[in-house]
């Protein structure tokens, strides 16, 4: 699945979800993160009574600006507005944790998510993108932690192919 540029649904063998009503999406303020938000909004719009929760995790709380708002507040506010633009009301959660993957999984448990939508960027140089990413292969990425430990199926949204 590392080389796919299409969204992929990843379901652990021990998970069973009869209905998807509560969708949680990770918010990171990146372009591929915006793609994940768009995908989550499109899904929730088609679910009668569906709800969307956006979670933004920071490793360390940043200092508020003059207006008393942090960068995390700005990222979440922009995501809420973007979701509204897709016709979806999104509940926003801001959390702090040294281990982002673990914090995302904890948030998914707390909001009782039926589906977790995450973005996964390929940070390798363009010349290496056709090759296997050893960090992901060995399970060293945030998205891999979430994929393995999330309490719900994970919809992995990859960045579109450049070209």
Q: Where are the model-predicted features located?
A:
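Gly/Ser-rich helix-loop-strand patches that form or flank binding pockets
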Residues: 1-16, 110-163
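Structural motif
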Residues: 11, 94-95
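Small/aliphatic-rich secondary-structure junction motif
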Residues: 18-69, 80-93, 113, 149, ...
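Charged docking surfaces used in two-component/phosphorelay signaling
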Residues: 95-103
């Amino acid at each position: 699945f590392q080389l796919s540029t299409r969204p992929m649904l990843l379901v652990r063998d021990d998970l069973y979800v009869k209905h998807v009503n509560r969708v949680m999406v990770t918010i990171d303020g990146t372009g591929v993160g915006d793609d994940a938000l768009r995908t989550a909004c499109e899904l929730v719009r088609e679910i009668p009574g569906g709800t969307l929760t956006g979670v933004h995790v920071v490793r360390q709380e940043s200092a508020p600006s003059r207006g008393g708002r942090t960068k995390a507040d700005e990222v979440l506010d922009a995501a809420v507005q973007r979701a509204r633009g897709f016709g979806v009301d999104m509940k926003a959660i801001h959390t702090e944790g040294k281990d982002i993957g673990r914090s995302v999984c904890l948030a998914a448990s707390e909001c009782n998510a039926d589906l977790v939508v995450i973005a996964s960027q390929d940070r390798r140089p363009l010349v290496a993108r056709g090759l296997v990413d050893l960090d992901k292969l060995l399970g060293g990425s945030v998205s891999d932690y979430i994929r393995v430990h999330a309490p719900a199926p994970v919809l992995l949204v990859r960045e579109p192919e450049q070209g």
